A protein has these predicted regions:
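Extracytoplasmic cell-surface/polysaccharide-interacting catalytic and binding patches
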Residues: 1-67, 139, 149-157
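Catalytic cores and adjacent binding grooves of peptidoglycan-active enzymes
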Residues: 8, 12, 51, 92, ...
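Solvent-exposed, flexible loop/coil residues
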Residues: 25, 38, 82, 87, ...
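Amphipathic alpha-helical interface surfaces
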Residues: 53-60, 70, 83, 99, ...
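Short amphipathic alpha-helical surface micro-motifs
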Residues: 55-57, 82-87, 119-126
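Extended, low-complexity, intrinsically disordered C-terminal regulatory tails
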Residues: 58-88
Length: 157
């Protein structure tokens, strides 16, 4: 049984999963398949060959993809400190560690995606909701942030 299958089973049983963060190279590994739906290049950062990535994050996103049966588009994965600062990210962002992704599911609203993510991470991890709404009319789409931090954090912006 591969690591993806093992972690997915543990997540379904609500078992705390601990996986090491791996380092990839965009020049060498960009097309490497991480799960049935995701490749290294989807988590890359502009201007960086290095991609740090927590395998559990990939499993969470694959579970979301399978649950909705629709494409999951990652808009931000790993970030270098320079890129994180340029996009206004928190100095303690989980993106800097390869433990976070911002994404949207084609044709599914932010609240529905976040509610399902909550079933995967009921007592830990970060889940942020960034809806496209009257308060945020300039957003081209809404998105969800998910991360694998040890403590539980939830927010809506």
């Amino acid at each position: 049984m591969d690591i993806f299958s093992i972690v997915k089973k543990k997540l379904k049983r609500k078992v705390v999963v601990s996986i090491a963060i791996k380092e990839y190279s965009m020049s060498r590994d960009s097309t490497r398949q991480l799960s049935p739906s995701f490749r290294v290049r989807e988590f890359g950062c502009k201007g960086s060959d290095v991609v740090l990535l927590d395998e559990e994050l990939v499993v969470l996103l694959q579970c979301i993809r399978e649950h909705f049966g629709k494409p999951v588009h990652i808009t931000s994965g790993y970030r270098t400190a320079a890129h994180n600062a340029a996009v206004g990210g928190s100095k303690s962002s989980q993106h800097l560690l390869g433990r976070a992704a911002d994404f949207y599911v084609e044709g599914v609203d932010v609240a529905t995606v976040a509610a399902y993510a909550e079933t995967l991470l009921p007592s830990r991890g970060g889940i942020g909701r960034y809806p496209k709404d009257a308060k945020h009319p300039k957003r081209s789409t809404g998105w969800v942030h998910i991360d694998t931090r040890a403590n539980k954090s939830r927010w809506t912006l």
